[in-house]
Amino acid sequence: MNATNCDYLLYNCTSLTSVDLTPLASWVNVTNCNYLLSSCTKLTSVDLTPLASWVKLTSNSSLLSGCYNLAFVSVLSTPPFTLSSGALTNGNNCPIYVPDDAVDTYKTATNWSAYASRIKPISEKTES
């Protein structure tokens, strides 16, 4: 896939409870992906790791805006991928699980630092 813009992909999918983003890892030319999964009000968890392959990404604001039922977010890539300001503000302050050896890196990374209190080592994850 040669997509460069996936703004509003899966936006307002109000019946979506889970999603596998693995196929998006092959979309290596994406530069903009604002509002991805935004307003998916029944989504309970998401693994954002596949987005790490988007090395050209410059904007991904409001990724999870309005996802009020999220129990957790996981991101198992190192280093942290580019994150726009406010991208993970979802209203419920759920934990963001990252690799154990990368917790400090995530907590100090640009725009990730805004979520430092929510960033936890994946080894502490108890939710399914």
How would you name each of these model-derived features?
Residues 1-128:
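Solvent-exposed loop and capping/linker segments of extracellular ligand-binding repeat ectodomains
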